Each structure stands twice: as C-alpha cells, then as structure tokens.
Amino acid sequence: MVTIVIKRLNKELNNINKEPIEGFTLDDYSNIMIWKGTLEGPKDTPYENGKFKIQFTFTPEYPIKPPNVKFLQYIYHPNFYKDGQICVDLLQNHEWSPSQNVCTIIHSLRSLFMDPNPSSPANREASELYIKDKIAYDAKVKENIRNYI
C-alpha cells in the first residue's frame, strides 16, 4: 500500500514541478509523506500579499482518504480553525475522491480565500463579522496578515 502512495505522491510532485500552481510554492518535500509550502493570498482579496505556510500530511490510505491539511499559523478566516485546521468539504472523507489531489486542494483553498463560506464556520467570530460588516472584516484580516507579508 505504501508503495502505491509513494508512486502517487511522486507523480503529483512531478506535475507540480512541471506546471506550477499559481500562488503556491512547495518549500519542503524531503519527507514524501509531509509536504510544506507557501500559499499566497489571492489578488483583490483582503488576504492579498499574505504568504501563508501550509502543511500536507499524507497517510498510507492516500489517495483513498484525503491528506491532513493545515496552515502553520493563525489566519483570521471563517473557515479556518485557530490551530490551522481547515473546514472545507473537500477534505472530509465523505466528500473526498481519489481523483482529487494536491492541485485540487490548492485551488479549493484559493477559492475559499476569495469566497469564504460563513454558513459552515470554523471561526464563528470571523463568520459573524463577515456577514454583518464586510468592511470591518476586511480590516481585521489585513491587520492579521501583516505578520505574514
């Protein structure tokens, strides 16, 4: 089983190196089962110019089960827990399919930066502020990401 995982991860790694993902840099993959990278905040969002460290931890069940994906610092966002875990359907076992991969996860996260889902909050305060006062929400995000520029 582990051999299948390693082959799959090497294939994904080769694809990322051949066709880099916009706004994403793979920083460390010296352990094929744990990848660390940097995800840039998308343009025209309050997260713009932010550089967010992210970690993918793959299990021997990958790609049958999704990797554990988390940010390595606190990001003020309705769908991100304070410990860096991410609340997005794609990363749940019942929504994951083996046809998905690191690229689809990155694209999903970039979309989440552009269009948070306040109806499924990991951070209730951020969700409520996003719904009630988008200007104040954007200001709080910009204040938070100053540490990550």
Language-model segments: which ranges?
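UBC/E2-like fold recognition across ubiquitin and ubiquitin-like conjugation systems
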Residues: 1-149
